[in-house]
Amino acid sequence: MKALLDLFKQVQQNEQFDAIKIGLASPEKIRSWSYGEVKKPETINYRTFKPERDGLFCAKIFGPIKDYECLCGKYKRLKHRGVICEKCGVEVTLAKVRRERMGHIELASPTAHIWFLKSLPSRLGMVLDMTLRDIERVLYFEAYVVTDPGMTPLKRCQIMSEDDYAAKYEEFGDDFTAFMGAEGIRELLRAIDIDRDAEMLRQELKDSKSEAKIKKYAKRLKVLEAFQRSGIKPDWMIMEVLPVLPPELRPLVPLDGGRFATSDLNDLYRRVINRNNRLKRLMELRAPEIITRNEKRMLQEAVDSLLDNGRRGKAMTGANKRPLKSLAEMIKGKGGRFRQNLLGKRVDYSGRSVIVVGPQLKLHQCGLPKLMALELFKPFIFNKLELMGLATTIKAAKKLVEIQEPVVWDILEDVIREHPVMLNRAPTLHRLGIQAFEPVLIEGKAIQLHPLVCAAFNADFDGDQMAVHVPLSIEAQMEARTLMLASNNILFPSNGEPSIVPSQDIVLGLYYATREAINAKGEGMMFPDVSEVIRAYDNKEVELATRITVRITEYPKNVETGEFEKTVTRYETTVGRAILSEILPKGLPFSVLNRALKKKEISRLINLSFRKCGLRATVVFADQLLQSGFRLATRAGISICVDDMLVPSQKVDIIATAEGEVKQIEQQYSSGLVTAGERYNKVVDIWGKAGDDVGKAMMDQLKVEDVTKRDGTKTTQESFNAIYMMADSGARGSAAQIRQLAGMRGLMAKPDGSIIETPITANFREGLNVLQYFISTHGARKGLADTALKTANSGYLTRRLVDVTQDLVVIEDDCGTSNGASMKALVEGGEVIEALRDRILGRVAANDIVNPETQATLYAAGTLLDEDMVEEIERLGIDEVKVRTPLTCDTRFGLCALCYGRDLGRGSMVNAGEAVGVIAAQSIGEPGTQLTMRTFHIGGAASRAAVASSVEAKSNGTVRFTATMRYVTNGKGGQIVISRSGEVLITDDLGRERERHKVPYGATLIVKDGLVIKAGTALATWDPLTRPIITEYTGTVKFENVEEGSTVARQIDEVTGLSTLVVIDAKRRGSVTKTVRPQVKLLNEQGEEVKIAGTEHAVTIGFQVGALITVKDGQQVTVGEVLARIPTESQKTRDITGGLPRVAELFEARSPKDAGMLAEVTGTVAFGKETKGKQRLEITDMDGNKHEFLITKDKQVLVHDGQVVNKGEMIVDGPADPQDILRLLGIEALARYIVDEVQDVYRLQGVKINDKHIEVIVRQMLRRVQVVDAGDANYIVGEQVERSELLDENDRVIAQGKIPATYENVLLGITKASLSTDSFISAASFQETTRVLTEAAIMGKRDGLRGLKENVIVGRLIPAGTGLAFHRARKEKESWEAEERTALLQSEKAARAAEAEAQFADISSTPDSDTDAS
């Protein structure tokens, strides 16, 4: 019976576990795993193909080759199970034990494990406090190390060369011991007293003052503490026994022709065994030291290359000079165990085929080829055949299916009914890349896909392939149906917009049907209802675009009862719109259709339908829109011809004018009036404008056509030109493309992104000549190369994002925090870029939202704001709302639903178990391929748009200046701005900010603070081409270091003959004058230097490189006068990183080069004494303490003497460093910075992503904290730990009434954050596998399997979605069972105790009668 049970035991699933621990194995442990020692390097006998005894494939050690059969064939079959054959020594059991039984090799000399030696920082070095170089010299037999100095003056761990050793040996004899090789290191490791060393280090840390020492000690202490905690002995890093991998995991397979294919590991093991055996022999023979030493070194190298080939020295190579693949390479990298086999597996019950369009399908269906379905659903068909008694065995059923018996098809229909399949299109960039559909059997071999889901899959029908997967279990089918069915996923999870938006011909059909034409056939007819309209249309009495009047039935929703009430209304509309009104879902008014439907409108329509009528109605509506769109597009019969491309008549004149202007510029250039750079910029500008003008003229001509009204008068209407309609509706093409067809192609770019100044004046209709064609191919190639690189880069960004966020899951409903972020509308340059409603939609209010007019609470805190609510908030003019955000969520090891808000892909509150981290990563990564790769050169053509020279108000209101705005009034009474960050605000009657405008330094203000103005009033003007340097004081100019030929050069204007001084670049000047900087001081009437008000510092105004000095030495100047101008052209064109690299830079939290400087404290600014190349800036804080900053002189300082700055304000111009923002302004400001910057990049490409996704990533970048003061908690100062863990530890400490640890936030880039997670499995599968595993093993780390990745790797259900509930139930059950067990044990204990008590009582109470009787 027991044997029978044993048989079943092997099938049963292993026990549940909650964590995985990694550590170092002791030699005893390795021997206990082993089933015997491998003594010979032989593998198998090449004649008999049987494994050699004691060899690498030995059956005695590793188990039999055939199931239940020993090697010599004495015992066969099940009845001998467990017998060990006395002839060949093989146990009779299953052959698959060869996958799990390990062997071992007893090493003749101890060997260091290369990971702990060479993986930086070297763990051996840290424990022994020796340098890696020294340890290596000892291990590879180049030097001796003293292990026991005895009574001699030598030190432990002292290194000496052979000659030194010989000399010392002569001197001291046997009083000291020194070793070479791993033995020496092992002795040193054994001698370490970890507890004592750790204590000493703690003391040193307290006493030490030097930063470097503290850092060093802390590192070593961390390693020692890890050993203390994990109970791992340091000398286990030196191996005495080498484990041997089970043979099936390093197979040897015979190929035809008598050759063998083998795993590289066998070669590596063979070398180790050979060298080991040779060393044993040499030691038995008592060979000379030098020979055994060499053999030991070779053994060490053999073991090294088995563990990690190529880590040290040259890699061992096989017969074909290819480096052998070691154990380390098996697990790391894309082809390693983690990423190849554990995170991504190949799946059974799957197939792939080309996709074709299936317009007749419903949204939740897909067409599955019969043959594919037959193969995929085989097991289900076999089952059915057996149940129906058509086949007795699986074999018979298989036969029936293979000959495709007619009954099989009926059964297939039956099996497929209501059994969803999953379709996937690679690359799967977001969760909509896999969706479930109900299969419909079709003839042919291609999968049919519903046209509306193409947008989500990013699929088209030019030969794309898709994979089909079959969910097998009932649970899997249920999840596929409820969560993944295409009709349940009609919104994009990235922004909450519909993903099933019609495109191309559907849009064209709907657009054509809803356009109106003047004086079309049957105009002005009246119809009682839509059916009559359809009759008239079918009888060709009216056209689609005819304007008619008709009674239309609508079903508005009654607010009180929630019922749909039938109403009939007369509408003036067109035939097409009336016909479309038939498919409008109940609850939507006809007015939404009563307009020309462009793509954006249709998207809005579907969104509206989803919000008002629910999911089911919307899906039906979308399907009907699709049908109508296709049908109407076919009826319309729109086609394009060459004559549709109307070339504007003005084109010739525009080009001629431009050519004239270019000639003029060329002449000015040849006569030296303009520089080469200016000429190029101006030419490019002229042609750019010419191209735009031609395009505009062409569009104006295309847009309208002449028609005759019914009364005979002439008028114009929107054109029915086919090309124009396609572009206008959003079906295909854009204005820019039409411009190339019928306008002019315009300027082309070179591969380096610079613009070729010769434009292509022709368009495609006229045709290009050879030169023009060549120019246009020149830049096109760059585009193709970019696209290929972009895809890889974008994929890598997505991978890093997923890795950093994969363990973030919604695990509770409410964390109870009242924190949040204040949201305002995003305004830039007076334009609202993102309205408040869009920013707070789908978020939860953190505070009560109050009606500003009545002060009544409008929405209580904790309300999820939906469309109607945000509209109400906007209507009331509330301009700031505090909402909950993932950043301030207090949930540990996860997020709460209220801080996250609406699940955008479902349109309702997020559910517990939703993997919001992965969704955020996908939402940001998925559009990555649409972003550009190039870094823009600002300057020249790209900056054309930026040349604004004034700013005007867009709305009526009151002018207000921000606190940072400063200006002086010059002699002419003009107000000149002298602050670098001043802004003008316009507020309405209630004092709410309506718009804000930045005003540059040197601008002239036209309005005053508090002025009431009308829209369109100019607020300020400035010269767009130069940047002035302005004086704020009156006095006489005194030049310093302004010397012609050394710091400045004189430029003479050839036309006017006037000369100006230009400051030259220090790099171009001689070495003597490099550090001198031309500047101006001002003198007063008495000839003394003018001082800065309230200080002793003289006013010094420095000139930057390229500045044109406009004043003369000794000239009298007044406040606000211009001393010099810097032409903006000569401002060095700085590269602005855009696109994908910018997003990656932000998420990696890289500090930009030449970063701007932020004020460390709030206080008053003063300039201190200047040093050679730097200027000194002092900020005196409120308590009177001074803080000094040294700033290189070429930087632009944004503050001036006496200005009060706030902590975190920019004081030196340059890009902000996210680390500074976090340190000085806190988490919310940092998040706002990263969110805004990332959104800028995506917005430029027209991609919408919800802010909360970026916030989720920022939360993960901030999940580590640095311990500032450990208090009584179990941490070292300066250690980085997981925030949640530290808070848990603090709770524990506080509960005991002790002092908790204090910490500061740390911002890590996404790669760094992924690698520093608490889960070593997740980190190892991401990057730097060796380093992660080495560190984890020494620390004896425990992986609690919290994240998704770890669970996928160990093959469990992930703790997200339905898996979260499963794991929770399991844990509850376990704790409940444990309680029950303890209760049971206690009751048994009590019973036993009672029993013993009773026995004891019996014994004591019986009188000694029996003794008497004896």
From Swiss-Prot:
Catalytic activity: RNA(n) + a ribonucleoside 5'-triphosphate = RNA(n+1) + diphosphate
Co-factor requirement: Mg(2+); Zn(2+)
A Pfam family it matches: RNA_pol_Rpb1_1
Enzyme class: transferase
Sites where the protein binds Zn(2+) 2: 815, 889, 896, 899
CC per GO annotation: DNA-directed RNA polymerase complex
Coiled coil listed as a keyword: no
One GO BP: DNA-templated transcription
Positions of Zn(2+) 1 binding: 70, 72, 85, 88
Keywords: DNA-directed RNA polymerase, Magnesium, Metal-binding, Nucleotidyltransferase, Transcription, Transferase, Zinc
Residues covered by region (Disordered): 1395-1414
Binding site for Mg(2+): 460, 462, 464
GO MF term set: DNA binding; DNA-directed RNA polymerase activity; magnesium ion binding; zinc ion binding
Cofactor note as given: Binds 1 Mg(2+) ion per subunit. Binds 2 Zn(2+) ions per subunit.
InterPro entries from the UniProt entry: DNA-dir_RpoC_beta_prime, DNA-dir_RpoC_beta_prime_bact, RNA_pol_asu, RNA_pol_N, RNA_pol_Rpb1_1, RNA_pol_Rpb1_3, RNA_pol_Rpb1_3_sf, RNA_pol_Rpb1_4
Superkingdom of the source species: Bacteria
Enzyme Commission code: 2.7.7.6
Family: Belongs to the RNA polymerase beta' chain family.
Function: DNA-dependent RNA polymerase catalyzes the transcription of DNA into RNA using the four ribonucleoside triphosphates as substrates.
Subunit structure: The RNAP catalytic core consists of 2 alpha, 1 beta, 1 beta' and 1 omega subunit. When a sigma factor is associated with the core the holoenzyme is formed, which can initiate transcription.
Protein name: DNA-directed RNA polymerase subunit beta'
Native source organism of the sequence: Herminiimonas arsenicoxydans
Gene: rpoC
